[in-house]
Amino acid sequence: MASRRRARQRALQILFIWDARKQPVEDAINAYYDTLYSDEKPERDPFVIDLVRGTVEHLAEVDDRITRHAEHWRMERMPAVDRNILRLAVYEMTRGGTPAPVTIDEALELARKFSNEESVQFVNGVLDAVRREMPEPNAPPARLNS
């Protein structure tokens, strides 16, 4: 099985295909694996598939969180790679069970690899703002006043 970092790269590439082609997520997953592996058909990494499907399934919530913290940027005006790095990271941070610092670090690595230094700073700022609005992992549950 691929490392988690490689899995996130693959998930990003699939999300990029999905976003660019405006096609069903399963078609994007198939297109990625069929294009990347034309002669052999490796076992699909469940972590990759879960990240992609989860991001798309919760897209409205994910995009809303990004939009609230991406000052002066509309989703459709962001570079596609940055938009999908943010989507992947916000999903993983809020629903995927990965600690926020790990998710942010991994997203910054993706931005360094697939985008530019300005994007690294932008991604860091947005994800840090999303992290700050999340409840602390070990915080006691909020009490309801009766």
From Swiss-Prot:
GO terms, molecular function: RNA binding
Single GO biological process annotation from the record: transcription antitermination
One Pfam family recorded for the sequence: NusB
Lipoprotein as UniProt keyword: no
A GO cellular-component term linked to this record: cytosol
Record has Methyltransferase as a keyword: no
Keyword field: RNA-binding, Transcription, Transcription antitermination, Transcription regulation
Signal peptide: none
SUPFAM superfamilies per UniProt: NusB-like
PANTHER family tied to this protein: ANTITERMINATION NUSB DOMAIN-CONTAINING PROTEIN, N UTILIZATION SUBSTANCE PROTEIN B-RELATED
Function field: Involved in transcription antitermination. Required for transcription of ribosomal RNA (rRNA) genes. Binds specifically to the boxA antiterminator sequence of the ribosomal RNA (rrn) operons.
Family: Belongs to the NusB family.
Descriptive protein name: Transcription antitermination protein NusB
Organism in which the protein naturally occurs: Solibacter usitatus (strain Ellin6076)
Designated gene of the protein: nusB
